Amino acid sequence: MLRKGVSFVGQAVQQTLKTQKNLRIQRFSATASQSSEEVNYEIRKDGKRLRGADYEEIVLTSIAGEDKTQIPKGAFDVLLKEYDDLQAESLDFKDKYQRSLAETENVRRRGIKQTDDAKVFAIQSFCKDLLEVSDILDIAVKSVKPEDLESGGKALKDLFEGVSMTRTVMAKTFAKHGLVTVDPTNEKFDPNLHEAVFQIPSANAKQPVGHIEVCTKIGYSLKERPIRPAQVGVVSK
């Protein structure tokens, strides 16, 4: 009987303690729920975003004693709006970044073009002067006939070879710096690129009217820019 009495008293005490604990939790939860409604969940302070740890502390403090796996509605609404704001800012930054890249690329291309233009302008006059020398070398080489070389002796042959080599080296130097010959024979006449020095009646020409039948003096272009027009004979009606 004594044991049963002790057991009964122990159960009664445990039940009383459990009831008191539940009452304390209910009172604390009600207080926390009420306080969470009054908490300011704004994630910005003085125009600056709070750190994650600081905002977490605010939220956890407001739900002390409650289920910490649930976010208060006020905090959820703030975080949802903050997400939308961050997404909009991200898109804005991305757009500005892409525009900045495009502008940087345009500046780089303009810089390269301006540098190339400056280089071409710097050597253009010098190239024009050298073209006259090249023309003279061409005339000198073409004026010597094979039979003249046979009868002219060793001195003439050596001179001819020296002039030919000079002409070849000059042509390679021209090509190295982007200066190339332009022979528009058989092409359509373009007054912007060619200089018509005479006309050929279509009855005596192989090319159609308006085309170049013969080139009497080759032209030159520097970096794809004409610096001397080719002198040509154009087919006319």
Swiss-Prot record:
<dbReference type="GO" id="GO:0030150">
    <property type="term" value="P:protein import into mitochondrial matrix"/>
</dbReference>
<dbReference type="GO" id="GO:0000774">
    <property type="term" value="F:adenyl-nucleotide exchange factor activity"/>
</dbReference>
<dbReference type="GO" id="GO:0005739">
    <property type="term" value="C:mitochondrion"/>
</dbReference>
<dbReference type="GO" id="GO:0042803">
    <property type="term" value="F:protein homodimerization activity"/>
</dbReference>
<keyword id="KW-0143">Chaperone</keyword>
<dbReference type="Pfam" id="PF01025">
    <property type="entry name" value="GrpE"/>
</dbReference>
<dbReference type="GO" id="GO:0051082">
    <property type="term" value="F:unfolded protein binding"/>
</dbReference>
<dbReference type="InterPro" id="IPR009012">
    <property type="entry name" value="GrpE_head"/>
</dbReference>
<keyword id="KW-0496">Mitochondrion</keyword>
<dbReference type="GO" id="GO:0051087">
    <property type="term" value="F:protein-folding chaperone binding"/>
</dbReference>
<keyword id="KW-0809">Transit peptide</keyword>
<comment type="function">
    <text>Essential component of the PAM complex, a complex required for the translocation of transit peptide-containing proteins from the inner membrane into the mitochondrial matrix in an ATP-dependent manner. Seems to control the nucleotide-dependent binding of mitochondrial HSP70 to substrate proteins.</text>
</comment>
<dbReference type="InterPro" id="IPR013805">
    <property type="entry name" value="GrpE_coiled_coil"/>
</dbReference>
<dbReference type="InterPro" id="IPR000740">
    <property type="entry name" value="GrpE"/>
</dbReference>
<dbReference type="GO" id="GO:0006457">
    <property type="term" value="P:protein folding"/>
</dbReference>
<protein>
    <recommendedName>
        <fullName>GrpE protein homolog, mitochondrial</fullName>
    </recommendedName>
</protein>
<dbReference type="GO" id="GO:0001405">
    <property type="term" value="C:PAM complex, Tim23 associated import motor"/>
</dbReference>
<comment type="subunit">
    <text>Probable component of the PAM complex at least composed of a mitochondrial HSP70 protein, GrpE, tim-44, tim-16 and tim-14/dnj-21.</text>
</comment>
<comment type="similarity">
    <text>Belongs to the GrpE family.</text>
</comment>
